[in-house]
Structure formats: C-alpha cells, structure tokens
Amino acid sequence: MGSSLILDNNFDNLNFSSLKIGIIQSEWNSKITDLLMISSRNYFLEVGIDNKNIITRKVPGSMELVYASNHMLINHDVDGIVTLGCIIKGETDHDKHIANAVSNGLVSVSIKHNKPISFGVLTTNNHNQALSRAGGNKGDKGKESAYTLLKMLDLVWV
C-alpha cells in the first residue's frame, strides 16, 4: 500500500518569502537519504521558499539528528526543521533502540523550542522497503515530510 497522505498545498497562513527552513540529513544509508533530501528540498522550492532560506546540514547517523536539530534551532533561527534518516533492521534490536531514541529526542527538542520538527526517518526491515518509500511505489517520504512541516507551520502561524 502506498502513502495515503494527500498533498493539497493549501497553506492559507504562510508567507513563503519569509519562511526559513532547516533540513538535516543523516549520511547513514546515504543512497536512501540523498533521495529524501532531494525530494524534500525540491518540494520547498516548488511551493516558493527561497533557496537562500533553506539551510541544509548532514550528520553521520540518525541519532545525531537530535543534537543537530537543537543546535540549528538555537543558532540558525529557523521556523522549523525536516529531519531525514534511514534506519534499516539488522540481526539485532539495535534499530528499535535508535528509532525510539531519535523519535523521543526530536519530540523533546520540538517542545523545548516550540517549533515543529518533521520526522522523515524511515524505519524499515530492508533496503528495498526503504527505496520504495524514498520516491518508489510506497510514496516519497522526503516530500511528505516537507509537506508535513509546512502544514504544521501553517497551523501555528494563525
């Protein structure tokens, strides 16, 4: 089953010319996260966000997304952040521990700074599942994460 998220691009309250967006990409599983980054960034450009207002950073792995998000919110005055990563199950439960720590950490950072952080971290059983969610037949989670951030910003800018 593909994604059921409908990208309506209906953002009544956003002034795209003044938005400043952060995108933080994990380099682990970069063949996947590169695709997520391209589609996320392209979506922001398509809706009219100026390229100079999109700040991108790369971190070694998904765990580092938490620290980097906190740092970006403190030092770059962004309105919100898209985090992109790919955690693929291995032989142990390590993936679950990483995914839980990252999701909980990003929620904490978002609440601490009162700014939205969109969770574009894939958690899959294998590489093919990840590819199918990075623009394949199961959706484009990079684009969907960018859309989700804009929907949240539209909500809070009322």
Where are these regions (language model features)?
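Glycine-rich phosphate/diphosphate-binding loop of Rossmann-like nucleotide-binding domains
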Residues: 11-56
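Structural motif
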Residues: 22, 64, 79-81, 115-121
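Short, ordered loop/turn segments at secondary-structure junctions
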Residues: 27-28, 86-87, 122-126
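Short glycine/serine/threonine-rich phosphate/pyrophosphate-binding segments
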Residues: 4, 33, 65-66
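N-terminal presequence-like segments and the immediate start of the first folded domain
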Residues: 1-20, 136-139, 151-155
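C-terminal binding/interaction regions
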Residues: 95-96, 100-158
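Glycine-rich phosphate-binding loop
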Residues: 64-106
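Short, charge-patterned binding micro-sites
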Residues: 60-61
